[in-house]
UniProtKB/Swiss-Prot annotation:
Catalysed reactions, semicolon-separated: dTMP + ATP = dTDP + ADP
PANTHER family: THYMIDYLATE KINASE (PTHR10344), UMP-CMP KINASE 2, MITOCHONDRIAL (PTHR10344:SF4)
InterPro entries attached to this UniProt entry: P-loop_NTPase, Thymidylate_kin-like_dom, Thymidylate_kin_CS, Thymidylate_kinase
Keyword Amino-acid biosynthesis part of the UniProt annotation: no
Keywords from the named record: ATP-binding, Kinase, Nucleotide biosynthesis, Nucleotide-binding, Transferase
Entry's EC annotation: 2.7.4.9
Protein's GO biological process: dTDP biosynthetic process; dTTP biosynthetic process; dUDP biosynthetic process
Protein name from the UniProt record: Thymidylate kinase
NCBIfam families in UniProt: DTMP_kinase
Species the sequence originates in: Streptococcus gordonii (strain Challis / ATCC 35105 / BCRC 15272 / CH1 / DL1 / V288)
Function: Phosphorylation of dTMP to form dTDP in both de novo and salvage pathways of dTTP synthesis.
Family statement: Belongs to the thymidylate kinase family.
Length: 212
């Protein structure tokens, strides 16, 4: 059986990744794709338990390296238990965050060594990278304003970080975009949701058609 495709959605907090993913799935399924959606951290019970620890607002003393290693542990279990089996079954796997989040948040955001993070990503994934990454770019202030307005969104520990941290995170994403422009495609997330979905679908379909 032909291996499936792995797509990751990345971007700063408030960029709307989850809303875009929710809108894309029925469209892609109507096109005949078997779609598996999942998220990081989380996706499987062990990884979801780690997610609770990472995002708990009460864990204010968490060290940056501790945070990174928890993400890496969650990533490994999620990959082995859910992502790889779906890819082997020929499915289209779309992940809400993956390896680029660690570079952005723990590398640029927390100031940890990016080379160390890239090595840990490689170790945890056995070198697996997404076939395509959609990076939803948004001004940091606008993203945080969206979070504040969204009463249905549970505020987590990372949401409580200051503006400068979130600005560094965005710079981390722009670093990854420049480093790997063939894999990462920038989407303007400041547009209306329907336009963001339209742009995302166009990029996805172009990639899917090139692989068919």
């Amino acid at each position: 059986m032909k291996r499936g495709l792995l797509v990751s959605l990345e971007g700063p907090d408030g960029a709307g990744k989850s809303s875009v993913l929710e809108a894309l799935v029925p469209i892609l399924e109507a096109q005949g794709h078997q779609v598996v959606t999942t998220r990081e951290p989380g996706g499987v019970p062990i990884s979801e338990a780690i997610r609770e620890v990472i995002l708990d607002q009460n864990n204010t003393e968490m060290d940056g390296k501790t945070e990174l290693l928890l993400y890496i542990a969650s990533r490994r279990q999620h990959l082995i238990e859910k992502v790889l089996p779906a890819l082997e079954a020929g499915k289209l796997v779309i992940m809400d965050r993956f390896i680029d989040s660690s570079v952005a948040y723990q590398g640029f955001g927390r100031g940890l060594d990016v080379a160390d993070i890239e090595w840990l990503n490689q170790y945890a994934t056995d070198g697996l990278k997404p076939d395509l990454t959609l990076y939803f770019d948004l001004d940091v202030e606008e993203g945080l304003a969206r979070i504040a307005k969204n009463k249905n969104r549970e505020v987590n520990r990372l949401d409580l970080e200051g503006l400068e941290m979130h600005q560094r995170v965005r710079q981390g994403y722009l670093y990854s975009l420049e480093k790997d422009p063939e894999r990462l495609v920038k989407i303007d997330a400041s547009q209306a949701l329907e336009d963001v979905v339209k742009d995302s679908l166009a990029v996805l379909n172009q990639h899917l058609n090139s692989k068919s």
